[in-house]
Regions:
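Mixed-charge, Lys/Arg-rich low-complexity intrinsically disordered regions
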Residues: 1-11, 64-87, 159-163
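Beta-strand-rich cores of mature extracytoplasmic or soluble domains
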Residues: 61-66, 126-128, 132-163
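Weak global preference for isoleucine
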Residues: 25, 61-63, 79-82, 102, ...
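Basic/aromatic-rich interaction segments and small domains that mediate binding to polyanionic partners
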Residues: 2-6, 12-60, 91-93, 98-134, ...
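Low-complexity, intrinsically disordered short peptide segments enriched in small/polar/basic residues
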Residues: 2, 9, 14, 58, ...
Length: 163
């Protein structure tokens, strides 16, 4: 079970598959074990507006320049106030659900993607993103260890050792 990020924020990186390059401005951890990184392009779009941040799995990230790396924690439990899988409630709207994804942004804004229980007909409902300060811990919920599954099947190129 992954419990820490591999890469620091504010480094120049690229996606090893597509070649997309940018500054690593966000990193997120998922209840089901993966970590992703948000790369913000350094150049503007053709219309002069900022280009969209793109997210890539940790295994696809290649660091190009770590000169300006942020001095930040990498352990999830030292970054986030509420553990993954916790049942939480939004203090503003009353929305309640489980924290499935936690995101750390470069400029000190941690956010949680929370998904509510199924509706009265048993249908899944859409989750919502909330800033950390808006959420109150309700209960333990489900731990990452309870949903961890061993890898099965073929080896994908992203799982092979890299130089």
């Amino acid at each position: 079970m992954q419990t820490k990020f591999k890469y620091l924020l504010n480094v120049v990186a690229k996606d090893s598959v597509s070649g997309f390059e940018g500054v690593l401005i966000a990193r997120n951890a998922h209840l089901f074990g993966c970590a992703q990184y948000g790369l913000a392009p350094k150049e503007l779009g053709s219309d002069g507006s900022p280009r969209k941040t793109e997210y890539f799995d940790e295994s696809r990230i290649e660091i190009l320049d770590a000169t300006n790396a942020a001095d930040c924690e990498n352990d999830y439990d030292r970054i986030f106030a509420i553990p993954l899988g916790s049942e939480v409630k939004d203090k503003v709207s009353g929305f309640q659900g489980k924290a499935l994804v936690i995101m750390e942004n470069l400029h000190n804004c941690n956010q949680y993607y929370c998904e509510p229980a199924v509706d009265k007909c048993g249908k899944p409902q859409d989750g919502q993103w909330f800033d950390e300060g808006r959420l109150a811990f309700v209960s333990k919920g489900i731990t990452p260890e309870e949903v961890a599954a061993p890898k099965r099947g073929a080896v994908f190129s992203r799982d092979l050792p890299r130089k």
